[in-house]
Amino acid sequence: MFLRYFLDENQQRVYTLKRTAPSGEQTLTAHPARFSPEDKNSKYRIIIKKRFGLLPTQKAKTVC
């Protein structure tokens, strides 16, 4: 069993062990992907993220 979550109406995470939320949608995994220092594809992922503006440094700053 893996910990999973879904977003409620207030966009807050609700953690569960089920694969579907009460609304019927799929839940998301609460665990990050595994990391390997020998990752051969990280260079290409960074290139793609730069191209599409997905790096954290490329996001607009939000004012709270």
From Swiss-Prot:
Q: What is any one of the record's Gene Ontology cellular component terms?
A: box H/ACA snoRNP complex
Entry's Gene Ontology molecular function annotations? snoRNA binding; telomerase RNA binding
Q: Where in the cell is it found?
A: Nucleus, Nucleolus
GO biological process annotations for this chain's record? rRNA pseudouridine synthesis; snRNA pseudouridine synthesis
Q: What keywords are annotated for this sequence in UniProt?
A: Nucleus, Ribonucleoprotein, Ribosome biogenesis, rRNA processing
| Main location (coarse class) | nucleus
Query: Pfam families, from UniProt?
Result: Nop10p
Q: Oligomeric state and partners? A: Component of the small nucleolar ribonucleoprotein particles containing H/ACA-type snoRNAs (H/ACA snoRNPs).
The family assignment reads: Belongs to the NOP10 family.
The job of this chain, per UniProt, is described as: Required for ribosome biogenesis. Part of a complex which catalyzes pseudouridylation of rRNA. This involves the isomerization of uridine such that the ribose is subsequently attached to C5, instead of the normal N1. Pseudouridine ('psi') residues may serve to stabilize the conformation of rRNAs.
Name this polypeptide is given? Putative H/ACA ribonucleoprotein complex subunit 3
